Amino acid sequence: MSCTTDKLIQKYDALVRKTTEHKFAKELCAGTLKDRSLYIYLSQDLQFFETSLRLICKTTSLAPTTHALITLAKKIGFFSNDENSYFHDCLELLAPSLTKEERDNFDNKAIPGVDAYINFLDELRKDASITWPSLVTSLWVAEELYWRWARDTPRAPGLHWKYQKWIDLHDGEHFQTWCEFLKAEVDKFPVEEVESIFVKVSQFEFEFFESCYNA
């Protein structure tokens, strides 16, 4: 019998694929994504990252087992070091592709499509009624979608580090192990309990790509 996460992926296959096969991901992996587009995406993702990190801290505090608590706590450290360093190094490299006025705008204001996602995560963080099943599902689906595009999208050889590092952060054994941990946690709950948040986050992830690509 299929588990909860497999049932959700199968039921919403079209939604999953339109996100994981988005032209943003395809062009990034092909090494053809414009510097401007990558800058906009990363500047927006950095704003998203800070809100998301606060939510992960809440999720960690509600972990039902010691194993889950330690796993999440370790991941917070990874996010704060490896991923955060990439943001700043890459944004500095890509800065000449936009005017200073454009950079200031994208660095300090979430664009439509991204702002709704950030607001949604902030609501999850602030709402005391949101419990572990919803929180761990929101984290799992976001990470699962990233792992799928990073793992499955054809890559050009010899990619510039601005592309390759972002792919590497979301692929490989370290990320697979992380996603499998989250998947196992979500599978402890019935589809009906986590379906709504799965759909919401999946749609937000698509809109994030779409908004940044077209900005």
From Swiss-Prot:
InterPro entries registered for this protein in UniProt:
Haem_Oase-like_multi-hlx, TenA_E, Thiaminase-2/PQQC, Thiamine_Salvage_TenA
The record, for CDD domains, names: TenA_E_Spr0628-like (cd19358)
> What Gene3D superfamilies does UniProt report for this protein, alphabetically?
Heme oxygenase-like
Q: What Gene Ontology terms for biological process does this UniProt record contain?
A: thiamine metabolic process
**What Gene Ontology cellular component terms go with this record?**
cytosol
Instruction: Please report which protein family the annotation says this sequence is part of.
Output: Belongs to the thiaminase-2 family.
PANTHER family in alphabetical order? BIFUNCTIONAL TH2 PROTEIN, SI:CH1073-67J19.1-RELATED
What additional remark is attached to this entry?
Answer: Present with 195 molecules/cell in log phase SD medium.
Protein name as catalogued: Protein PET18
Q: Give the organism the record lists.
A: Saccharomyces cerevisiae (strain ATCC 204508 / S288c)
